[in-house]
A protein has these predicted regions:
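N-terminal catalytic or cofactor-binding beta/alpha core of small enzyme domains
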Residues: 2-155, 160-265
């Protein structure tokens, strides 16, 4: 792809578009650091909703329903640095490697995304340069600063999942996801199951791999950090009361696990 092809495109983000991400608790003292890659559902004005009605962007395909409020509330309780990505995962999925076929999906849960069909190499690169790359650069900058300051980091990737997928009801209230490093995952899985009122998935409803995921392989395993990916079922955090309840539960569990996890760091 020639640079001229990329420069010839109209700007993706305009002055009226929202910021790429929001940082919560920027001076947070906690060792926990929270990432919410799918928190937002915004679309640049130039792309006119990706050609979709708002009702589609409001579905689970457009964002991780409820995870923004849950992450904010948890960050406040823990005094933990957190980043919330603003734009819809249908625009570009910030938890996908650049080579992933679902980085910019043409179809998601049976919905065709018109603005994603037949993208040129330059259009694809424009979204990477405007959204994916600077978002992860900000995370890298924070992790670098903590490393250089000698601060331990316990990394949590915050996600939510739809209760029903392809007609199948999902029984889990939460899922603990991991790839090769199980230090945080196994401790959290046990702690959540010890709550007594939860069905918790072990690498369910999804599993993590280096070809399907970005944050765990790159920010977690790539840096050798103690890390976990947490999934919460969306109907449980669809409103403020559910988000606050889960934030309170997780803050209590994370605080109890902190000494054990820091000893592993």
């Amino acid at each position: 792809m020639a640079d001229a092809d990329l420069h010839a495109l109209p700007a993706l983000l305009g002055a009226d578009d929202p910021a790429l991400y929001t940082i919560h608790q920027p001076q947070g003292a906690s060792p926990f650091l929270l990432l919410a890659d799918h928190a937002g559902q915004q679309v640049p004005r130039a792309l006119a909703g990706l050609g979709l009605p708002q009702a589609e962007l409001d579905r689970h395909i457009g964002w991780d329903i409820g995870i923004a409020g849950t992450t904010r509330a948890l960050a406040e309780r823990l005094d933990a640095w957190a980043i919330e990505q603003t734009y819809s995962r249908l625009l570009i999925d910030c938890n996908r490697p650049l080579a992933s076929p679902t980085l910019i999906p043409e179809v998601s849960d049976h919905t065709v995304v018109p603005a994603n069909v037949g993208l040129s190499t330059a259009q694809r690169q424009q979204r990477i340069d405007a959204i994916h790359a600077p978002y992860h650069a900000r995370i890298d900058a924070e992790l670098d600063a903590r490393r250089d300051a000698g601060r331990a980091t316990l990394l949590v990737m915050m996600h939510s999942f739809t209760p029903v997928m392809n007609g199948m009801q999902r029984p889990w209230q939460a899922g603990v996801l991991y790839h090769q490093d199980t230090r945080f995952a196994h401790a959290l899985l046990q702690a959540l199951r010890d709550e007594g009122d939860l069905v918790v998935g072990d690498n369910e409803p999804y599993s993590v791999s280096s070809t399907s995921d970005y944050a765990v392989p790159v920010h977690g395993e790539g840096r050798g950090l103690v890390h976990v990916e947490l999934e919460i079922r969306q109907d449980l955090i669809a409103d403020a009361a559910g988000q606050q309840a889960w934030a309170e539960r997780l803050a209590r569990i994370f605080s109890a696990l902190q000494p054990q996890l820091l000893a592993l760091a």
